[in-house]
UniProtKB/Swiss-Prot annotation:
Tissue: Expressed by the venom gland.
UniProt entry tagged with the keyword Plastid: no
Native source organism of the sequence: Cupiennius salei
GO term, biological process aspect, one: defense response to bacterium
Designated name of the protein: Short cationic peptide-1d
Statement: the UniProt record of this protein carries the keyword Secreted: yes
Length: 15
């Protein structure tokens, strides 16, 4: 799902 991708990207961006 798209949500999964966003969560993965968000985690990378947050760090």
């Amino acid at each position: 799902g798209f949500g999964s991708l966003f969560k993965f990207l968000g985690k990378k961006v947050l760090k």
